[in-house]
From Swiss-Prot:
This protein's UniProt keywords: ATP-binding, Cell cycle, Cell division, Cell shape, Cell wall biogenesis/degradation, Cytoplasm, Ligase, Nucleotide-binding, Peptidoglycan synthesis
Family annotation (InterPro entries): Mur-like_cat_sf, Mur_ligase_C, Mur_ligase_C_dom_sf, Mur_ligase_cen, Mur_ligase_N, MurCDEF_pg_biosynth, UDP-N-AcMur_Ala_ligase_MurC
Location(s), subcellular: Cytoplasm
Main location: cytoplasm
Catalytic reaction equation(s): UDP-N-acetyl-alpha-D-muramate + L-alanine + ATP = UDP-N-acetyl-alpha-D-muramoyl-L-alanine + ADP + phosphate + H(+)
One Pfam family in the UniProt entry: Mur_ligase_C
Pathway: Cell wall biogenesis; peptidoglycan biosynthesis
Official protein name in the record: UDP-N-acetylmuramate--L-alanine ligase
Residues holding ATP: 126-132
Keyword Cell division: yes
Similarity field: Belongs to the MurCDEF family.
EC number(s) recorded for this UniProt protein: 6.3.2.8
């Protein structure tokens, strides 16, 4: 953004007085890094710290942001405010130093709320689908020439980044319920895609507490705001009488205000109709597979319709939607000959889904789009607590693939829980389905173990939220040894 554009932006969005230097602890997280990038482009001095370099820190470094790859009290020197990720413990030396120096320490969502204060905020929340829905809303607004600012939890492929500073009054953000911090946000429009039991440690294991927090989030809307809610979700349906705001519902249900009909899927493309109240029916061609993505698109259309975006821009944006990183992400179609000497090809898909509902949606999209392919899944459970809380659901959904290779649980900083392990999960799947999952205790052995299982026309699904994304890239770039016959861009043009 040039100085003229920034000056124009300042007429709508005043700068934060007395704030010149903002320090982020845990800056390598997608949400943290996105906010840091937007603030850097607004002209603030940004520094940050994290324990390891990643794609986010590399991108921020290219913007000239100073990043320390260690935590030390000197890192916060001269900061006006310190922003912390919920993953950072209270005894972090930088937090302690900030308190001693009387430097304000705030949560990520508090800074996101500050970005939203003088903007037209659109917040997308829900247990599943919020990253993709955020990307769809941002894509539609960009297609319409509205130049929004966005902050997303995943890479928006068309933009090549998680976040971007726009010149308009619109701010589109992913609202994270994992630590309940989304309650700080005060948008004008809010989407809730669904509500399921997840991150229950945050909510003291009380599902009613989780539901009430979502209601409180929606009641942050002004009386003239609007809640966009998926009526297919039974929890949301039961909560409707408790939500005292203007509501637009969407879904496959007959009583939805924006109703999906005639859904079909052909490989990576979804086709369906959207019936809207007092509006023309939209014939959608969506460049993303699965009924779950049709729901995400319906939510995005509801927001765009509310704002008066022309149908032409909506249709174009969804037709050319390039998706988000690690969401049914096709890394290529590879020949088998260099892998195990067999003839034919295999398709490699990388997917972030780590909750049973998300895994089931991925499997269903694969089965519908490619009914003749065997599904070979490499799965990495994420967190001991989630594996424990949703154990039976994991057993059920992981029994639905043809071949399963199971990695060890990615702890995400949690301590092990007795009797909760990938080995136990494999045993339970074996007892439940009589399938024979393969436990992989060493990532370096995965390529050879996988090669023994592969046959012509297989689809390999690399599934999970830990460090398994690196496994997928390694398989694509190194272990398969040859470039794919079809690059991923061919599916997301």
């Amino acid at each position: 953004m040039n100085q003229k554009q920034l000056t124009k932006l300042r007429t709508m969005v005043p700068e934060m007085k007395r704030v010149r230097h903002i320090h982020f602890i845990g800056i390598g997280g997608a949400g943290m890094g996105g906010i840091a990038e937007v603030l850097a482009n607004e002209g603030y001095k940004i520094t940050g710290s994290d324990l390891a370099e990643n794609v986010v820190t590399q991108q921020l470094s290219h913007l000239g942001i100073c990043i320390f790859f260690h935590h030390h009290r000197d890192n916060v020197k001269n900061a006006s405010v310190v922003v912390v990720s919920s993953a950072i413990p209270e005894d972090n030396p930088e937090i302690l130093a900030a308190h001693e120096a009387r430097i304000p320490v705030i949560q990520r969502a508090e800074m996101l709320a500050e970005l939203m204060r003088f903007r037209h905020g659109i917040a997308i929340a829900g247990t599943h689908g919020k990253t993709t829905t955020t990307a769809m809303v941002a894509s539609i607004y960009a297609q319409a020439g509205l130049d929004p600012t966005f902050v997303n939890g995943g890479l928006i492929k068309a933009a090549g980044k998680h976040a971007q500073l726009g010149s308009s009054r619109y701010l589109i953000v992913e609202a994270d319920e994992s630590d309940a911090s989304f309650i700080h946000l005060q948008p004008l429009v809010a989407i809730v895609t669904n509500i399921e039991a997840d991150h229950m440690d945050t909510y003291q294991g009380n599902f009613e507490h989780l539901k009430q927090t979502f209601i409180n989030f929606l009641h942050n809307l002004p009386f003239y705001g609007r809640a966009i809610l998926c009526i297919d979700d039974q929890v949301i349906r039961t909560l409707l009488p408790r939500i005292a705001r203007h509501i637009t519902t969407y879904g496959f249900s007959e009583d939805a205000d924006i109703k999906i009909t005639g859904y079909e899927q052909k490989e990576f493309t979804s086709y369906f109709m959207l019936e809207r109240v007092h509006k023309p029916i939209l014939k959608i061609q969506l460049n993303a597979p699965g009924r779950h993505n049709a729901l995400n698109a319906a939510a995005a259309v509801a927001v765009a319709t509310e704002e008066g975006v022309e149908d032409e821009h909506i249709l174009q944006a969804l037709s050319f939607f390039q998706g988000t990183g690690r969401r049914f992400d096709c890394l290529g179609i590879f020949p088998l000959q260099p892998v195990n000497g067999q003839q034919g090809e295999v398709m490699l898909i990388d997917d972030y889904g780590h909750h049973p509902t998300e895994v089931a949606a991925t499997i269903k999209a694969a089965r519908v789009g490619w009914p003749t392919k065997r599904l070979v899944m490499i799965f990495q459970p994420h967190r001991y607590s989630r594996t424990r809380d949703l154990y039976d659901d994991f057993v059920n959904v992981l029994s639905q693939v043809d071949i399963l290779l199971m990695l060890e649980i990615y702890s995400a900083g949690e301590s092990p829980i007795p009797d909760i392990s990938s080995c136990a999960l494999c045993d339970s799947i074996r007892d439940f389905s009589h399938r024979m999952p393969i436990l992989v205790t060493d990532h370096e052995k995965l390529p050879s173990l996988l090669a023994k299982q592969l046959k012509e026309n297989d689809m390999v699904l690399v599934q999970g939220a830990g460090n398994i994304g690196k496994v997928a890239r390694t398989l694509a770039e190194c272990e398969l040894k040859v470039p794919p016959l079809i690059q991923k861009e061919s599916h997301y043009a």
